[in-house]
């Protein structure tokens, strides 16, 4: 039997390309499992196989614990020490017992356990092999097609899944087709396929350019950002520190060969290659291509930009179903508002008029000073109250006394506004817990109250579309606010 064990280990190790130690461990677990089945009680068993001779010994063991819950598998520290053992908590006390004989049932049990453990070892080895390839493009053969996913054969007994959302909208595959995808997930705990590929992720686009454009692989050209509407359109931003190289031309290739190769792999996805710029406004202008931007106004406080285009160019700037401006927003990370030059002029005229009235109400200065402040781009009391004093003093035609009056008036106006807000909150009976929601302030609470939202629970029941029309609240902020309320209301024991 000893030689048979060594022969089994050698054979399985060679057949499965697994280390001999993994097979020995599987055998030990298999023999321990077979031994346990010989006892009516639930016991803990350990088997040790000599790696050189194949001899094996069997031990029944008890874990040392403070309080015994399972008497057949546990022993107290006092009892273990009484028997002369030098142990501590979580150690094991062992007694050698008779090893199991290999009858039909024992052999069948051992075989089942060995098969299971070998599969687990193969799965672990597969995970180790592919984990270092996460973020790279993998090629596979379509093995099976189901409603929700594709199963790919990667070779060497490795399989991968492409989920439905990881495919492009118009893609149709047949068994035997060779396809490529970006490896994004390796999950050792999963049953069956543990490798997940995607063709819709932005990283797929980036890696395809890295393959097709040698200058990117050599890091002469850098991909700074990318955004995709998978299978339809994409934008990718590139830059280079080598002034001799045209990064856009290098990515397009001779007669468009390089970008066409990427586009063909992605079902004809149209790709705009744009030049990266460290200046956010200039980068957004580049990202809006092929539309021509007439003017752009940046609101850093709200991380938004107002973009003006000619009325004849508005449809192109927005794109079909808002695609062009949406991709430009994704690749830049800014919220973009596209409008005609006439609409932008009208909007800023309204904003200037509103700012003029606020300043006139709160600042004890002449209309000439107020017009100067509005012309300089100031639109709120907060800006005037907290802007560095030296910046106010640098404004032409303003005296030190006028600057002092502006600063005092702005701060007093904010205090009165805060007091008014507190009174309104009290009168509207806004719940105090609503004011404690992460991201909430008194002004926002009042705007919610105008929508009959007075409590955390009422906020938690809202959708982003319900709040998106609130001034100075974008969709991301609205989503975070709602989730903060839901965390308090739905997932906390107290509100």
UniProtKB/Swiss-Prot annotation:
Keywords: Cytoplasm, Repeat, RNA-binding, Transcription, Transcription antitermination, Transcription regulation, Transcription termination. Residues 302-370 form the KH domain. Residues 135-200 form the S1 motif domain. GO terms for molecular function: DNA-binding transcription factor activity; nucleotide binding; RNA binding. Its main location: cytoplasm. The keyword Nucleotide-binding does not apply. Pfam families: HHH_5 (PF14520), KH_5 (PF13184), NusA_N (PF08529). Residues 364-489 are annotated as: 2 X 51 AA approximate repeats. InterPro entries: DNA_repair_Rad51/TF_NusA_a-hlx (IPR010995), KH_dom (IPR004087), KH_dom-like_a/b (IPR015946), KH_dom_NusA-like (IPR025249), KH_sf_prok-type (IPR009019), NA-bd_OB-fold (IPR012340), NusA_bac (IPR030842), NusA_N_sf (IPR036555). Sequence repeats lie at residues 364-414, 439-489. It is found in: Cytoplasm. GO terms for biological process: DNA-templated transcription termination; transcription antitermination. GO terms for cellular component: cytosol. Monomer. Binds directly to the core enzyme of the DNA-dependent RNA polymerase and to nascent RNA. Belongs to the NusA family. HAMAP family: NusA_B. NCBIfam families: NusA (TIGR01953), nusA_Cterm_rpt (TIGR01954). Participates in both transcription termination and antitermination. This is Transcription termination/antitermination protein NusA. The lineage of its organism: Bacteria, Pseudomonadati, Pseudomonadota, Gammaproteobacteria, Enterobacterales. The gene is nusA.
